[in-house]
Amino acid sequence: MALIQMTLFEKPETNNHVADSYTGIYSMHKYWSKKPHNIIRDFILKYSKEHEIVVDPFCGSGISITESVFTNRKAIGIDINPSAIFITRQMLSKISSKDLTTAFKIIEYKCKDKINNNYLIRRDGKSFVGTHFYWENKTLTEVWYSRGKSKVVEKPTYEDIELAKSFNVTNIPYYYPKRNLFHNSRINANREQHVYDLFTPRNLTSLALLLDEINKISNQKIKDILKFIFTSSMGQASRMVFAVKRRGKYNGKSRLSERKEVGSWVIGYWIPKENFEINVWNCFENRFKKVLKAKKKQEGNGYLLDEAKDFSELSQGNKNLLLLNESVISALKKIPNDSVDYIITDPPHGNRIPYLELSMMWNEWLCHNVNYDDEIIVSESKDRKKDLDNYNALLKESLNQIDRVLKPNRYFSFIFNSIDDDTWINLVNLLNSFSFDLEKVETLGYSANSVVQDNREGGLKTDFIFTFRKNPANIKNKIELLTINKKKNQINEKIDECIIKSKNGLEMYEIINYLVMEFFKKNKFFKLSEVLNIIKEDYSKVDNKWMKKEIVK
């Protein structure tokens, strides 16, 4: 493999990328492992030109696709997850803010009062609309509502409790998802659970009514953006919203405050013992306002959007977007040899994020057909039989197709993060088996509001971006695996080198970043678990940074 020289410390602005926060259209809808749009744009600008074809075979929420279109490229977004393609299309869709507001007002007229009636609070002969209901171990213990300009927090009355109990899933006259979750303890999913169990019967009833009215909208473009707002608001309407209890001081002593703050649905299907039930209409309206603000700003963007039906139409005409909801292997097989100018992608990282399982809530509400069998993932769900062997086989064929469709001497950027030894070693060997010359290894920081950053000791707090050049004359060299038994000295030398260069010590992940950069370019790699043990045994930790023991003394 050929590689230009780089280090973690020289020219850090080019090798270690700092993320912007998710704002505007990128904050409209949750999706896991979103990559910072500013960094993705930099790569697209560097490795492709206007009107060239950029492909993301695992496009997720479509950040690479939107940035390609915004920078006047032709973009192909592929993802096996229907929700991913749906979100990507809505991110790019230019919607008239006037038409969207009109449609919202129609939904508001038909639904708001009906939904709010499900949350009525009666006090002193007057009716108020409840905003939040606090549950502890499935018992309603607190109700929140507005009384004039005042926010009221009270214990529930008998009438409040009976109203909440009056809702039953068997009595809902509208569609709601009844599918069981896959059993996966990693994401707190139990096969005995249904999708509808993620919601209180009252919120389930309200959501079903809301979606039923949205589905009656005749304009498909408007209907889709309203569905997008619906799924975007769904997490906050679920039972997965936890309570935040702040610590404060009383008489000089630290204690938990009685006042609770509303948390949010983060990742997985964990239902806290103490959780909020939030008024569904408020969830939907709040998300509508956020989407409307982003879409108003997007209206002024100068880009044009013209979606193609297939690769031929995209490549030969003026079309600039092709979205394919299918497996990466079957989608890439439809693309001719040596026909793509740049590929950038962030594939599933082993068992880190089971995308289709996590997206089941959205996919089932929107009645999407999902191909679980061909997902490239390692899942801890025994229901799925998605082990490392299956992952490696599918990833290998995907890389084979990427190699085939990329033009000679053009670039392929591959984003990755894992703390699993076997996943890393297999990936390194796979990448080495194709006609790719490694050009550069860089790190990508997470956005400040990312929910997937691994903060465990030894967790990689940045992703790696490996950029390759397709070289048909590539000479393949076998990857040498450095082990503690045979090559510990080489590993120690590199750790010493990076710590000395840093002067003030490094965090664990920074040392790992340096070792990956230094060894991979020399066709060498290591077991992450062994390196973590070397660091813990041979170095000293001071204020979360590792140093040579003699320096600490």
How does the language model describe each region?
Residues 3-54, 71-336, 352-384, 398, ...:
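Nucleic-acid modification enzymes, centered on SAM-dependent nucleic-acid methyltransferases
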Residues 58-62:
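Class I SAM-dependent methyltransferase "Motif I" SAM/SAH-binding loop
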Residues 63-72:
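Conserved SAM-binding loop of SAM-dependent methyltransferases across substrates and taxa
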Residues 213, 378-439:
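Conserved Class I SAM-dependent methyltransferase catalytic core
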Residues 343-344:
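Hydrophobic beta-strand segment of the Class I
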Residues 479-481, 522-553:
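Charged low-complexity interaction tracts in eukaryotic proteins
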Residues 495-503:
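Short amphipathic alpha-helical interface segments
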Residues 502-515:
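Short acidic, hydrophobic short linear motifs in intrinsically disordered regions
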